[in-house]
């Protein structure tokens, strides 16, 4: 039997006044989406002088104001956070949400997240090494009551985690990764692997890919993850394949037909979770050259017309 499809919304409500952020998240929940995700940056990445709330604090508040939808950060980085603190934050949200946390982790790379928090910018090799240690710490702390870890970059000594996670053995772990080094970490630890429908190099260059090129790139990543899973002794099917959509020229937000076509093409190569951007209207035009996002009408149409058919 094929794996159940899941559909989420990436909604950067950190940009919005808190009461509006709550309303928007409750609206997504009411429509029946499976998950809702926040970003994690110190500064607003679209308009640098606009508001930007901290992700874990806001996620905890949203957890207390929703009841069904699963909640996560896509993805939380360790640039300004010790891994033990991330584990404790995750456990707290896990309990506030009554077991609805999706734990999303990534290596982080935005320069302003370093400079604005007084953390020197890491070289790529150090970033990956730090990420590997951090994931190992968080994974262990959320599984066990006591953790000791002696790494090159992070040390945890007799760290106590009580109460235990409501979800066992820990909240589901999503690792965002597109390069070989971080995908190998995903192969070892993740329950779900998330990637973009574009390569990181093309994203940094501000490109959007034609549909078939993007599909081919995702298929190549998918095959690589299978290979890395086998090397660490895991079954490839143990890791859900998750896609953050909107970087292609032909976007799923164009129409209901485009949405169906997008989902079917990526489902055919093994993706079973789809996360779509919904930005506030005043931001959509600012990112249009790099990112295709949903508007409210499309958020509603997909929920009422497409999701019941696809599930």
Where are the language model's segments positioned?
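Active-site-adjacent structural elements that line small-molecule/cofactor binding pockets in enzymes
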Residues: 1-311
């Amino acid at each position: 039997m094929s794996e159940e499809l899941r559909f989420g919304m990436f909604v950067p409500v950190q940009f919005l006044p808190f009461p509006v952020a709550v309303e928007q998240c409750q609206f997504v929940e009411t429509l029946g989406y499976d998950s809702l995700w926040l970003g994690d940056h110190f500064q607003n990445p679209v308009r640098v002088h606009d508001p930007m709330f901290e992700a874990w604090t806001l996620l905890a508040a949203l957890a207390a104001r929703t009841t069904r939808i699963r909640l996560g950060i896509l993805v939380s980085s360790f640039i300004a956070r010790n891994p033990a603190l991330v584990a404790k934050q995750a456990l707290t949200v896990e309990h506030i949400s009554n077991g609805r946390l999706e734990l999303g982790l990534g290596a982080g790379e935005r320069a302003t997240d370093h400079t604005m928090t007084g953390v020197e910018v890491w070289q790529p090799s150090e970033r990956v090494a730090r990420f590997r240690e951090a994931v190992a710490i968080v994974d262990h702390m959320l599984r066990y009551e006591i953790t000791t870890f002696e790494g090159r970059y992070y040390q945890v000594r007799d760290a106590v985690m009580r109460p235990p996670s409501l979800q066992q053995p820990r909240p589901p772990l999503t690792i965002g990764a597109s390069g070989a080094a971080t995908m190998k970490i995903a192969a070892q630890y993740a329950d779900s692997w998330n990637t973009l429908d574009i390569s990181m190099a093309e994203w940094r260059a501000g490109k959007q890919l034609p549909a078939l090129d993007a599909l081919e790139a995702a298929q190549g990543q998918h095959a690589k993850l299978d290979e890395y899973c086998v090397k660490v002794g895991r079954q490839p099917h143990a890791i859900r394949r998750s896609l953050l959509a909107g970087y292609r020229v032909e976007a799923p937000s164009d129409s209901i037909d485009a949405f169906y076509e997008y989902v079917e093409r990526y489902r055919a190569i093994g993706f079973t979770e789809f996360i779509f951007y919904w930005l506030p209207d005043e931001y959509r035009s600012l990112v249009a050259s790099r990112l295709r996002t949903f508007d409210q009408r499309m958020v509603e149409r997909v929920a009422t017309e497409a999701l019941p058919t696809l599930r």
